[in-house]
Amino acid sequence: MKEQLNQLSAYQPGLSPRALKEKYGIEGDLYKLASNENLYGPSPKVKEAISAHLDELYYYPETGSPTLKAAISKHLNVDQSRILFGAGLDEVILMISRAVLTPGDTIVTSEATFGQYYHNAIVESANVIQVPLKDGGFDLDGILKEVNDDTSLVWLCNPNNPTGTYFNHESLDSFLSQVPSHVPVLIDEAYFEFVTAEDYPDTLALQQKYDNAFLLRTFSKAYGLAGLRVGYVVASEHAIEKWNIIRPPFNVTRISEYAAVAALEDQQYLKEVTHKNSVERERFYQLPQSEHFLPSQTNFIFVKTKRVNELYEALLNVGCITRPFPTGVRITIGFKEQNGKMLEVLSNFKYE
């Protein structure tokens, strides 16, 4: 057994609504607002696509997801040879880490970001440098100071999970210009579709300028397919060729591929969902207490407080399951009614 596994623990999901009801003696409905899922669900066309292909379940998937690859290639205007799919971004991160890292290698990322960058590096016996956040966001200058010719991977999450903050195009361009050209910079844009900031990076354009800039996106968030597990990376043809050796032959299921293609084709539905999210998100920042909220470009808001357990339980008491962290609580933006209940709690809560 790998000794470094002793440094890690298996992922622990939050308690189910039923378990929470029993623990806290809560009556009535509970809403799961802890995992940043798209509560509106996928496009109706996704359900139609799934129903149309149920008779194919006994077939193995087509390896490499060629139908979805062609759709993504057209959507992003990138060559198919530069795209690799995984069963969610979790698997994409795992494949890249497994392909690149050897014992003693070093990755550089941030503290308080998506935990799978750290997790998979430790599994591969690599060292992890985690730079503290600055004003709740990635400190690109601080990360740059830790990067050198021997760095194996740099992981950036934009917008960042769990804080919701982002860095802009100019900042990323400047950062990439100073990273050694052979050091891969992985930019995780899982929440890209929710972004409304005009100065958010055009990472695809930056890829034309920097061969070591690699882009990750997913169908789990705005497209509403978290239960079907489809994520992908857009990288250099050479990197994809090598990483593809690591990919399990049938990692993305046949139904998942059909569903993702249907979701991608219904951009009007995506626009409707992301617009609803931005409208509801703005309601939180209209509160006088929003000084305690980190600025978000996602479908969640990070609320800073020293009284984490008290806030978590106060939100739970109005039927909203959220996600506590050491320095605050992450709230998935819900429907109007759910948000109204949370806004009432947040407007009366004592944060210090």
Swiss-Prot record:
Q: Which GO BP terms apply?
A: L-histidine biosynthetic process
Output the PANTHER family linked to this UniProt entry: HISTIDINOL-PHOSPHATE AMINOTRANSFERASE, HISTIDINOL-PHOSPHATE AMINOTRANSFERASE 2
| Cofactor names | pyridoxal 5'-phosphate
Name of the protein this chain belongs to? Histidinol-phosphate aminotransferase
* Similarity comment: Belongs to the class-II pyridoxal-phosphate-dependent aminotransferase family. Histidinol-phosphate aminotransferase subfamily.
In terms of superkingdom, the source organism counts as Bacteria
Which residues does this entry mark as bearing N6-(pyridoxal phosphate)lysine?
K221
Could you give the subunit structure recorded for this chain? Homodimer.
UniProt xrefs under PROSITE patterns: AA_TRANSFER_CLASS_2 (PS00599)
Which reaction does this enzyme catalyse, per its entry? L-histidinol phosphate + 2-oxoglutarate = 3-(imidazol-4-yl)-2-oxopropyl phosphate + L-glutamate
- HAMAP family (alphabetical): HisC_aminotrans_2
Please indicate if the UniProt record lists Ribonucleoprotein as a keyword: no
The main enzyme category here is transferase
Q: Which keywords annotate this record?
A: Amino-acid biosynthesis, Aminotransferase, Histidine biosynthesis, Pyridoxal phosphate, Transferase
**Annotated signal peptide:** none
- Which EC number(s) does UniProt give? 2.6.1.9
